[in-house]
Design a protein with these regions (language model features):
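Bacterial N-terminal signal peptides that target proteins for export
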Residues: 1-10
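C-terminal motif of bacterial Sec signal peptides marking the signal peptidase cleavage site
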Residues: 19-22
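Bacterial lipoprotein signal-peptidase II cleavage site
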Residues: 24-30
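Hinge/beta->alpha junction and helix N-cap segments in small-molecule ligand-binding domains
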Residues: 35-49, 64-74, 96, 119, ...
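Hydrophobic alpha-helical
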Residues: 89-108, 173, 192-255
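Flexible loop/hinge segments that line or gate small-molecule binding clefts
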Residues: 98-136, 140, 144-147, 154, ...
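Hinge/cleft segment of the Venus flytrap/periplasmic-binding protein
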Residues: 176-177, 277-331
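Extracellular/periplasmic ligand-binding modules, especially the Venus flytrap/periplasmic-binding
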Residues: 220-229, 257, 267-285
Length: 331
């Protein structure tokens, strides 16, 4: 038993070293592509910096492709178009699993390894997922909201239905609310990839006297928080409303500092892309049978899920996150 533990430790160290250090096996003909939607979002700019950092360390090429706006159909087509480039590997964030699942399978059938990051399609042939435990992220936000509401109040959610990571977060919130019958979900509103729709809907709830009073607004994706905060800023009588956001772009962190956003649940898009490229590179140079199912294989060379973590940011620690963001942009 003692010897087995030592061997396991040495093996684990070897895997970590292979993913965190460059070596002569690489050449600049290798290309790794990240496919996503809403590429203009700050969230994906952070992911791009992680992808670029890993590519620089390994001396390989990287690219981010996908529609600038929220368009799941265009994302699936972009993935298919990328196959002609014969990339060494693909990272994919899934906007709609019914569209992206078949496209991922086409890539794998063509011999291109695929990992999902940020949002998953577990029923596809992707090898594994690197990202947030989105159910747990929802639980984290839900516990915070239940505490701030003292167990009672009306809540509106802003999301894009059918996007797997957002659906998982909503389930996390709902799981928490089961213990608080005084918390009611008034609406789960589809912003259709445009945070301006969240702004308009929030103004509706704050100004329409025929609408039910809403005590809290929850943003399940990264862009709506700033727009909901702006709506509250313009309505002086709404300072008692609670906003729980998602992710840590500058506008969201500033909203927390100014008091218009109570808290945000942050992720690590830099880490997802950084380790995603390195993992794909390892698969490219030490190939396995991509068409084989590894889900129930006790000797699988691949994990099922790599959790990059999530954290709650509020006024008590927002300065730390703002400082980290400023340092990263000044490099």
């Amino acid at each position: 038993m003692h010897i087995a533990v030592k061997i396991g430790a040495i093996s684990a160290i070897g895997v970590l070293l292979s993913l965190t250090s460059g070596c002569s096996r690489h050449d600049n003909s290798e290309r790794y592509i990240l496919i996503t939607v809403n590429t203009r979002l700050p969230y994906w700019k952070v992911a791009a910096s992680g992808l670029a950092k890993a590519a620089e360390q390994y001396g390989v090429k990287m690219d981010i492709r996908g529609p600038e706006l929220y368009d799941p159909t265009a994302e699936a087509q972009e993935l298919r178009n990328s196959l002609a480039l014969k990339p060494a590997g693909l990272l994919v964030s899934v906007a709609d699993r019914s569209l992206m699942g078949p496209a991922i399978d086409e890539a794998v059938n063509a011999g291109i390894p695929v990992l999902t990051i940020d949002s998953d399609a577990p029923e596809s042939k992707r090898l594994y997922f690197i990202g947030t435990n989105n159910m747990q992220a929802g639980v984290l936000g839900g516990k915070r909201l239940a505490e701030k509401l003292h167990g009672k109040g009306n809540v509106v959610f802003y999301t894009m239905p059918e996007q797997p990571n957002l659906d998982d977060r909503l389930r996390g919130y709902k799981d928490v609310f089961e213990d608080y019958p005084g918390i009611q979900i008034v609406e789960v509103f589809n912003i259709k990839g445009d945070s301006g729709n969240a702004f308009d809907r929030t103004i509706h709830y704050l100004t329409d006297k025929s609408a039910r009073r809403v005590d809290a607004f929850v943003c399940l994706e990264s862009s709506a928080g700033r727009d909901v905060a702006e709506a509250l800023r313009r309505q002086q009588h709404a300072s008692d409303r609670i906003v729980i956001a998602m992710d840590a772009d500058d506008d969201t962190l500033t909203g927390i500092k100014q008091g218009f956003i109570d808290a945000t649940v942050t992720e690590k898009p830099f880490t997802m892309a950084f380790y995603g490229l390195k993992a794909l590179d390892d698969i490219h140079h030490y190939p396995e049978d991509l068409k084989r199912s590894y889900a129930s294989n006790s000797f699988s060379p691949f994990p099922t899920f790599v959790d990059t973590g999530s954290t709650l940011v509020d006024k008590s620690n927002v300065a730390e996150y703002l400082k980290a963001e400023q340092e990263s942009t000044s490099k």
